[in-house]
Amino acid sequence: MDEARAREILAATGLPRTRNAELLALGENAVFATAGPDGPVVKIGRNATDHPELLERARREVALASWLAEWEVPAVRAAEPAARSVDGHPVTVWHRLPAAVRPAGPADLVALLRLVHALPTPSAFSLPRRELLGGVERWLRLAGDAIDPADADYLRGRRDGFAEAAATLTPYLPVGPIHGDALPRNVHVGPDGPVLVDLETFSADFREHDLVVMALSLDRYGLPAEAYDTFTAAYGWDVREWPGTPVLRGARETASCAWVAQHAPANPKALDEFRRRVASLREDDPEVRWHPF
């Protein structure tokens, strides 16, 4: 799905003020801010015709927003009560957040994670397990001939190996609701404080999933050591002490490589980043810098 196709879907929603909508993000989803200071934000997923789980995920994300509001967890709020399906694409509509007053940092993230990790499992709907590796095959197929078939097979092998290893893990923390992609980029700091955004990976699983993300950021994405120390001190525990961390880290690295691969057919920078990531995994070098994409 490129920007042109996403704008076609946006226009087909029939929502007002979509013609000059601002593209905020284009990755797994396309996210648009419609015109006007109070115009809603529209999130468009990839075609779900052959992947009905994408529509189910969008429906669950809207339900989650209402549930988090009931528990007074600061998070994005849906502007419509249910997800739509527009020409096969999941579409959700959200209230626009006030302008950010500053970038989010680890302290903002950890404050929200502590709230999420204290939540019970919802009773009105079910949360899935955090299937870190569930999208690998779909992403590799979208990459097609743009990537080396040997690299695709290598990632499939890693996927299978880490899936098997993850099934044997014993958590240190209680199992329960998690964000699933716990990074400062998924926190918006407005005038009233930090707000959690991008709820589609919310799951019920090991809380360690949410902590491994920052440990990986320290090694792969240039997170300063002081920032990581702030995060662990505020949370009260460093996930690197847990023996299961290398398994969850390896699974996440595998998924991150495959996720970038889906953009390779249309974006040379994505292909370069994919090759960098796969090479570092093949060489077993855990400190090669990866670039956010």
Where are these regions (language model features)?
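A cross-family kinase active-site recognition segment
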Residues: 100-153, 173-175
